[in-house]
Regions:
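Redox-cofactor binding/interface segments in oxidoreductases and associated redox assembly factors
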Residues: 36, 140-144, 184, 267
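Active-site glycine-rich loop that binds ribose-phosphate moieties when present
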Residues: 149-157, 161-173, 190-201
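Short secondary-structure boundary segments
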Residues: 66, 145, 268-270, 299
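Small/aliphatic-rich secondary-structure junction motif
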Residues: 2-85, 161, 178-244, 262
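Structural beta-alpha unit
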Residues: 1-29, 69, 103-141, 233-265, ...
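Short beta-strand elements of ligand-binding domains
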Residues: 142-146, 166-172, 295-299
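A short acidic, glycine-rich active-site loop
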Residues: 84-100
Length: 299
């Protein structure tokens, strides 16, 4: 399989000033604290807005990268290449998708002079290779979970191949105050613990943290382990235990988040595996489908 292609050596058009794809841009991208991954033109602004907030909250660097599957730049089975070519009929060609993303990125940059130094990396070819190339070293990746095929495939790779901490933008316009009140959905399982540990840098910066324990055991093990983890990580937060009643756990989390005026949710994602969650509609799938808040997660 050939390595992913990073842009070209040609000088970008004037309207794309700042969109150079050179080794220095890629180097800055892979070492950023927060990466806005841009596979879908429809979610560019939300991803960039929330990534900017996430980076600013921890006094870290931000980067932005376009990734896209391109059958002309990949070595793959004929069926995969045919699928990508067929997909172009519905979603435009790889170059057209990049042009739309680059244009949206340039529009976003023009809003604030503070964004002038931010450049857009570009990786096209085999999508999994591009995800690895752009995201492997990044602490937090902001990426959509829905949208075009690139967005859906990249989201899967981020969680299950790269095991990244992923921040999914809300479906509507992002309104700011990312870390005003972070609600953590907690069960004493490894995937939930990994998510909290990975997000510690952002939890330290949060104004308020609530750890939500739903349907705790009789011995109070959910609440006890939640307090222990907060202590181990040097975090201050409230631990709340509630019953789901007749609701699903996903519904209960969202109802609580609304009542508590949460600004971000943090969960351990897909405890039962991706396919089982898709088939049975478990907690992660429900939150991804119905949450109006930014959703931070790690598998």
């Amino acid at each position: 399989m050939s390595p992913p292609a990073h842009g070209s050596d040609a000088k970008p058009p004037p309207q794309w000033a700042g969109l150079k794809s050179i080794s220095s841009v890629h180097e800055a991208t892979i070492h950023a604290a927060v990466l806005a991954l841009l596979p879908d033109p429809a979610t560019v602004r939300n991803c960039l807005d929330i990534a900017e907030d996430a980076a600013r909250a921890v006094h870290g660097t931000m980067a932005a990268a376009h990734i896209g599957a391109d059958p002309e730049r990949m070595i793959a089975a004929p069926e995969e290449v045919d699928l990508q070519i067929l997909r172009d009929m519905n979603e435009d060609s790889p170059s057209q998708r990049f042009e739309r993303i680059a244009g949206a990125f340039a529009d976003w940059k023009r809003v604030s002079p503070d964004r002038e130094s931010l450049l857009l990396d570009d990786c096209r070819g085999d999508l999994s290779r591009c995800v690895t190339a752009e995201c492997h070293e990044t602490a937090l990746v902001v990426a959509p979970c829905h949208g075009n095929m690139d967005a859906r495939d990249a989201f899967y790779d981020l969680l299950f191949r790269e095991h990244k901490l992923v921040l999914v933008p809300p479906p509507d316009a992002y309104t700011g105050n990312l870390l005003a009140h972070v609600v953590i959905g907690w069960k004493p399982h490894e995937h939930a613990q990994r998510a909290v540990v990975a997000a510690r840098r952002w939890l330290v910066a949060a104004d308020r943290i609530t750890v939500l324990c739903i349907n705790d055991k009789a011995d109070g093990s959910y609440q006890r382990t939640a307090r222990e983890l907060l202590d181990q990580l040097g975090l201050e937060g409230e631990v709340v235990a509630i019953s789901s009643g007749g609701r699903s756990v996903g519904e209960t989390i969202l109802d609580f988040a609304r009542s508590a005026t949460a600004t971000c949710l943090l969960i351990g994602a897909f405890k039962h595996g991706y396919l089982l969650e898709l088939l049975l509609g478990r907690v992660t799938r429900h939150l991804l489908s119905h949450s109006k808040l930014p959703l931070m997660m790690k598998h």
